[in-house]
Amino acid sequence: MNYQSTRNAALTASSAEAILNGLAPDGGLYAMPALAGLDFDWQRCLTLSTQGMATEILCALLPDFTHAEMEQLVHAAYTGKFETEDLTPTVPVGEDTVLELFRGPTSAFKDVALSMLPHLMTAAKKKCGVDDEILILTATSGDTGKAAMEGFCDVAGTKIIVFYPDGGVSAVQKAQMVTQGGDNTCVAAVRGNFDDAQTAVKQVFAKVGGEDLLAGKGVRLSSANSINIGRLAPQVVYYFRAYADLVRRGTVAVGERVDYVVPTGNFGDILAGYFARELGLPVGTLVCASNANNVLTDFIRTGRYDKKRPFYLTSSPSMDILVSSNLERLLFLLSGDEQLVAKLMRQLTEDGAYEVPEELKEKIQSIFWAGCCGDDETKRTIGRVWQEHHYLCDTHTAVAWNVAQQYKTANPAHAPVVVLSTASPYKFPAAVLEGLGEKAEGDEFAVMEQLERLTGIPAPKNLCGLRERPVRHTTVLDREEMLPFVLEKAQEKKWF
């Protein structure tokens, strides 16, 4: 079963090739047109362990790999790496359920996929007979960078460069990245916001591929962002895990719908929920929760995507995005029309906006609902959830919780609700403290200790240990400097 570019049906790739390439040659994303037609036993999947679920789901989405191969890759990726054996536990909070995706090695939801991607990529290299070194380029709004470097750290045959917006991530997120160890990791701040960094990374891919700038040099580029299908596919697993937990608790019977509320920036996490739905999981409504950068809220409500608007730096920086790359995959999968998608993406590049046809808008609105939440209300929500339920959530989760309540008010006949919690509150301790009515004092580590004293909830060990780690990465670049920087690093034999 081949993947194809969202912009050109003639550009196809096997799942292994799609993982290695990251982006299609024309700048489109790889998608599986026959996703809904896969023969997948979703009910049996609910009876398996989390690793068993991952094996079945990834075999369905990445058919180049045998069941035995995938089983080994999943075991290597997840065994002993997370706080709990089920990787992503669910917690009843009030009348809703919180899906905790931050129990991995970097305390963010990206760990689920980025623990898996290096193993998939290494296996894909062997399947495709590729001897070149893989150079991973990744733009991050905060969490992807650290999780990607943690996953690829000292993996043979790979190097990774992470670009983050200078001043656009939390102090803890920055500390996680600039102290990253490993001989094959590199981090650079980019002057501008996340969209600037992400657009520049895509331009590097296009320039290097279009002009063969690395031809014959033993290096090929790939991505660890959710534009890479190998990054996106593992995220489908926790939708099944959450549903199985609700069945086990008696919240739903098998076959009854569940609504999922997802804090959304680049549209990858919520798109994984759509994939789960296409595989048969009884997903009701996928609720897209945005912060003040509410371009997706407006799009889902109106069918018009318009990035020509103010960009806000918020307390939920992983959602500070105006160009949501994975939305392109959804447009392709719902329309089946790669020419339409190519036209819309051209309009976005040239005009900064596009509008989808009415029929496509109605399809989107039949599956998705959207709401947004500003910074002040985010912090009030943190305090309210703590006071009412004694549950401590980070800023992104607070946005999702707030939008979940909006959704339930607007839709009284809603199904049971699962709120995805994407990061530990200790990654954003100052904002969380403000939400609890306290003033943050001192550096990020002192603030973490302050939050621990106030709540009695211990900070993750991986975050506490940052204080002792030396800063290794200090590069700051303009966007125009990124291509020469990548070409130079690609040719360096040793980085450290």
Question: What kind of feature is each model-predicted range?
Answer:
Residues 1-496:
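PLP-dependent amino-acid enzyme catalytic core
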